[in-house]
Amino acid sequence: MAYASRFLSRSKQLQGGLVILQQQHAIPVRAFAKEAARPTFKGDEMLKGVFFDIKNKFQAAVDILRKEKITLDPEDPAAVKQYANVMKTIRQKADMFSESQRIKHDIDTETQDIPDARAYLLKLQEIRTRRGLTDELGAEAMMFEALEKVEKDIKKPLLRSDKKGMDLLVAEFEKGNKKLGIRKEDLPKYEENLELSMAKAQLDELKSDAVEAMESQKKKEEFQDEEMPDVKSLDIRNFI
């Protein structure tokens, strides 16, 4: 089970839930005590409900990992896709965000009080960098160029409350998207590619952890005569 916990914690989609679960284990919830002398408060019941909700989600994730075969080979597209599908199933069972949903949530919550377009784009840049996303198409540069053009035309900084100015900016974005070959109907494909990219990175980290663990084991005297197995042959289900 220790390996399973470590394995699960490598998934960014699950990290938040697991951290909460660990925190709940550390909190002395008085509602769990068998003392009959004190009344149960609503706050205790709410905390108890949160605890069991997170615990059930964690168990659901472990149950899925007991059934699904995961190959630690980030260079194999089929293995990456399988891992991504397993993580998607876990997210759905545990009612957690996908990477694209998490990014959208970050954007919605962190930009709601930003008044001007430039600060908004800078915040998007910050979120992209923080999430480890690359801008291979150059869309970010295009958006700043579009903003420069609009602000030059209106001769003042563009506020998000300026409907006419924002319409001009959106029109410039659409021109830029067309040049870059970005289409709205392709958004589901971009989201899928993002999930696969994240899955590959996580699978690569899992592989590195497995190799490190085996090499550490190999240094122990009782294992020096044993041949280290190919990491791709490991079956995670055997460790859960």
Curated annotation (Swiss-Prot):
Transit peptide start-stop: 1-32
One Gene Ontology biological process: proton transmembrane transport
Compartments it resides in: Mitochondrion; Mitochondrion inner membrane
Function: Mitochondrial membrane ATP synthase (F(1)F(0) ATP synthase or Complex V) produces ATP from ADP in the presence of a proton gradient across the membrane which is generated by electron transport complexes of the respiratory chain. F-type ATPases consist of two structural domains, F(1) - containing the extramembraneous catalytic core and F(0) - containing the membrane proton channel, linked together by a central stalk and a peripheral stalk. During catalysis, ATP synthesis in the catalytic domain of F(1) is coupled via a rotary mechanism of the central stalk subunits to proton translocation.
Biased composition (Basic and acidic residues): 210-222, 229-240
MF terms in GO: cobalt ion binding; copper ion binding; zinc ion binding
A single cellular component GO annotation: mitochondrion
The protein's name in its UniProt record: Probable ATP synthase 24 kDa subunit, mitochondrial
Pfam family, one: Mt_ATP_synt
Keywords linked to the UniProt accession: CF(0), Hydrogen ion transport, Ion transport, Membrane, Mitochondrion, Mitochondrion inner membrane, Transit peptide, Transport
Superkingdom, natural source: Eukaryota
Transmembrane parts of this sequence: none
Database matches in InterPro entries: MGP1
